[in-house]
Every structure is written in structure tokens, then in C-alpha cells.
Curated annotation (Swiss-Prot):
Job description of the protein: Component of the chloroplast ribosome (chloro-ribosome), a dedicated translation machinery responsible for the synthesis of chloroplast genome-encoded proteins, including proteins of the transcription and translation machinery and components of the photosynthetic apparatus.
InterPro entries per record: Ribosomal_uS19 (IPR002222), Ribosomal_uS19_bac-type (IPR005732), Ribosomal_uS19_CS (IPR020934), Ribosomal_uS19_SF (IPR023575)
Assigned keywords, A-Z: Chloroplast, Plastid, Ribonucleoprotein, Ribosomal protein, RNA-binding, rRNA-binding
Gene Ontology CC terms, in alphabetical order: chloroplast; mitochondrial small ribosomal subunit
Miscellaneous comment in the UniProt entry for this protein: S19 alpha and beta forms differ in pI. S19 beta form is the minor least basic form.
Protein's name according to its UniProt entry: Small ribosomal subunit protein uS19c
Subunit structure: Component of the chloroplast small ribosomal subunit (SSU). Mature 70S chloroplast ribosomes of higher plants consist of a small (30S) and a large (50S) subunit. The 30S small subunit contains 1 molecule of ribosomal RNA (16S rRNA) and 24 different proteins. The 50S large subunit contains 3 rRNA molecules (23S, 5S and 4.5S rRNA) and 33 different proteins. uS19c binds directly to 16S ribosomal RNA.
Pfam families noted in UniProt: Ribosomal_S19 (PF00203)
Predominant localisation class: plastid
Length: 92
């Protein structure tokens, strides 16, 4: 279910402050965050945000097509390596 339109999109306060500070200085640097639930807003476009996936921070460059999505959607947490091979020799 989607978020109510009466409410504003969720963006962590510390992340919003960092982005606004960089926009005032007109600088681009990697912003490290653990806030995967934050929604991408238009002021984030052009910044590189390192999103935590549970083990490391993955740097993601924010484009205009990502607006409205959550940061966590772009940093996968699971690494599926495929199903186990069918080992018939060990069954004998």
C-alpha cells in the first residue's frame, strides 16, 4: 500500500541537512547513510549517496528517474548465488 498523499515523503532529518548544506556550497561529495527508508526527493539529484546494505556502503548516483523511490531499493541486501547443485554421489 502506498503512503497517503496527505503526508509528506519520509526523508531522514540528518540526510536532508547534509544535502541542503552541500547544495548551498554547490559541492558534490559522497554522503554516507544507513537510512534505507528515506524517499528520494528532487533536491538529491546529482549527489552520490552511499547506502548501507547490511555489510558495506554502496555508492549510488541519484538521477531524476529515481525520484519517488526509496534509497533501499538501489542497494540489494541479499546475494542469491543459485540453488545447490544436485550431488548424487554423496547420496550413495
Amino acid at each position: 500500500m502506498t503512503r497517503s498523499l496527505k503526508k509528506n515523503p519520509f526523508v531522514a532529518n540528518h540526510l536532508l541537512r547534509k544535502i541542503e548544506k552541500l547544495n548551498k556550497k554547490a559541492e558534490k561529495e559522497i554522503i554516507v547513510t544507513w537510512s534505507r527508508a528515506s524517499t528520494i526527493i528532487p533536491t538529491m539529484i546529482g549527489h552520490t549517496i552511499a547506502i548501507h546494505n547490511g555489510r558495506e556502503h554502496l555508492p549510488i548516483y541519484i538521477t531524476d528517474r529515481m525520484v519517488g523511490h526509496k534509497l533501499g531499493e538501489f542497494a540489494p541486501t541479499l546475494n542469491f548465488r543459485g540453488h545447490a547443485k544436485n550431488d548424487n554421489k554423496s547420496r550413495r
